[in-house]
From Swiss-Prot:
UniProt keyword annotation of Cell division present: no
GO biological process: photorespiration; reductive pentose-phosphate cycle
Protein name: Ribulose bisphosphate carboxylase large chain
Lineage of producing organism: Eukaryota, Discoba, Euglenozoa, Euglenida, Spirocuta
Site, Transition state stabilizer: residue positions: 315
Length: 435
């Protein structure tokens, strides 16, 4: 492999797709051989020389390991940079992209561990993807909500409620001041609550809350199903009801299904909320798997208006910077290389719409100053237990979140330092809102 696929003198082309792999070779295996093997097994190579190699232009189609750098503080671990010619990949297909780059190479026996840390998608390939159904700006225009983060809540308990009681919980949260409520990712169409009943009860709650508050409201109706035809049926029913948004579990559902649903949502005026159920199976190990920044990039290409991205509150500073790095990759039009934030390559999105990050998991009103400072306005903050756990009920819990959010945004706009004064801002808001 090394003689053919390790090319340290290679000059990267503007149209190459670049990958950064964290690579741990087996003891005794040279890093150059492993890097070349990764390039070979994820492009044109196989375990032996075959006579049909002579029937193709191998230099045109092969992947190349063009750089290796040791990982600081780790023994026998390297970042291998691999360049792939754009002609290896089908236009507009995240499925084909990932099948080629990570489909087989992770089982290669010369490697102890392998992790895909980042991808550089060139403009020539980015332009073959539709991206999010609508994007952040169109979503704000449809909701008529500007200048603050959007607020949401996952309805709990996530399993076991009847459709009628589920709709009641949705109504109380929306009436209290939230912009969205959410189906849990586990909720599809079980015996205790079939999807059509849930869609009907939740849409009734949306319209009732809208009429009382004068605001556009939404509920993430989970359209995930066992086959794409059934997903289309559920999304079509949501469109008939006139609700603004549906939801998909994109990793368990698959990228092909996600892209299909995204295109349907674009054509039928639905926003698409994406949950990342199963992501930790792929991205939790530091030395093996795929980093979430790659899953976030590929989701933006496949299509999604929202994507769960973690909270960063309470984590180490380094983790915070890495999380904010892939949050920027989700929503910004152009992101510069910045290794301190885990961004290995400069990424130009060529005008593709942004995906709004969703912060959820263990957050409540006292986190609001930090969340406002970290995420800014273009984010959706999801308070599950932080809403439904309020001692006075769902609507007061929602009101508490809304008041805290607006107080923090106003304080920030007035130039106050939320990192120092955030607690005071929340306590001042308590005087005007007993919730």
């Amino acid at each position: 492999y090394r003689l053919t696929y390790y090319t340290p003198d290679y000059q990267v082309s503007d149209t190459d797709i670049l990958a950064a792999f964290r690579m741990t070779p087996q003891p005794g295996v040279p890093a150059e051989e492993c890097g070349a093997a990764v390039a070979a097994e994820s492009s044109t190579g196989t375990w032996t020389t075959v006579w049909t190699d002579g029937l193709t232009q191998l230099d045109r189609y092969k992947g190349r390991c063009y750089d290796l750098e040791p990982v600081p503080g780790e023994s026998n671990q390297y970042i291998a940079y691999v360049a792939y010619p754009i002609d290896l990949f089908e236009e507009g297909s995240v499925t084909n992209l990932l099948t080629s780059i990570v489909g087989n190479v992770f089982g290669f026996k010369a490697l102890r561990a392998l992790r895909l840390e980042d991808l550089r998608i060139p403009p020539a390939y980015i332009k073959t993807f539709w991206g999010p159904p609508h994007g952040i700006q169109v979503e704000r225009d449809r909701l008529n909500k500007y200048g603050r983060p959007l607020l949401g809540c996952t309805i709990k308990p996530k399993l076991g409620l009847s459709a009628k009681n589920y709709g009641r919980a949705v109504y109380e949260c929306l009436r209290g001041g939230l912009d969205f409520t959410k189906d849990d990712e586990n909720v599809n169409s079980q015996s205790f609550m079939r999807w059509r009943d849930r869609f009907x009860x939740x849409s009734e709650a949306i319209y009732k809350a809208q009429s009382e508050t004068g605001e556009v409201k939404g509920h993430y109706l989970n359209a995930t199903a066992g086959n794409v035809e059934e997903m289309y049926k559920r999304a079509a029913f949501a469109a008939q009801l006139g609700v603004p948004i549906v939801m998909h579990d994109y990793l368990t559902g698959g990228f092909t299904a996600n892209t299909s649903l995204s295109m349907y949502c674009r054509d039928n005026g639905l926003l698409l909320h994406i949950h990342r159920a199963m992501h930790a199976v792929i991205d939790r190990q530091r030395n093996h798997g795929i980093h979430f920044r790659v899953l976030a990039k590929t989701l933006r290409m496949s299509g999604g208006d929202h994507l769960h991205s973690g909270t960063v509150v309470g984590k180490l500073e380094g983790e915070r910077e890495v999380t904010l790095g892939f949050v920027d990759l989700m929503r910004d039009p152009y992101v510069e290389k910045d290794r301190s934030r885990g961004i290995y390559f400069t990424q130009d999105w060529c005008g593709m719409g942004g995906t709004m990050p969703v912060a959820s998991g263990g957050i409540h009103v006292w986190h609001m100053p930090a969340l406002t400072e970290i995420f800014g306005d273009d984010a959706c903050l999801q308070f599950g237990g932080g809403t439904l756990g309020h001692p006075w009920g769902n609507a007061p819990g929602a009101a508490a979140n809304r008041v805290a959010s607006e107080a923090c945004v106003q304080a920030r706009n007035e130039g106050r330092d939320l990192s120092r004064e955030g607690g005071d801002v929340i306590r001042e808001a308590c005087k005007w809102s007993p919730e």
